Amino acid sequence: MPRPSRRGHAQPPKPVIIVPPFFGRRIELPVGWKIGVDIIIFGGYIRSFLQLLLGMIAFGQSGIGPDRHYNGNRFEVLNVKCLESGEYVLQNTKIYSNSLITRDVKDLKPLAGDKIVMNFKTPFTGAYMPLNLQDVIRLVRHRLIFFVNEYGSGEDIPPVDAKGNITIKEMHQHILLRRSIRSDKDFFRGWTGSIFADISKLSERARWLLSCASVVGMGPDSAFGSGFLEISNI
């Protein structure tokens, strides 16, 4: 039986999120191919990092997905780098636990600049597209609230008004065949692409939420690695 949330009635978000690379289609990776995977750990669960790392190594040895029964889909964890410290936590089979540091989202600086581009690394699975800037800020805030309530201090994150223009550079729709036990859905509809935004009129609070978006993403289905993006100035 799922454990209850600390606040509210919805099931709590996962404390560990794996954000895999998204290729937009099913592909077969040749032997020896290397890919990078982002892992985000929230709250006190950072203390379980070594168990998580050993679990990833064990998964690699046994394989993942149906093809593991045929000795397929096996992988090796070559190295792990902490993005906050910039140092390796795992390198050449050696573990450097002191290289692992954390950051509180409260310490993130508001996003600077007047114009930005948002590139979706993984599909955004919200109810509709295109979005306006108010939608973006609202979706980031909602996701952040879930994590702060469950793994943070639970402090209030007030709504923010956002005025600005958004231009869709390119957008691609994807049908993702992934099973959700919570919602009993067989598939998700998602979008990837790039969005230009004029943020010159945004408040400091709204700019801070955009900085948070680079960490926690936006929209629903965070457990599936959905809605993660990169934001850069232009």
Label the predicted regions.
Residues M1-I234:
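RNA-interacting cores
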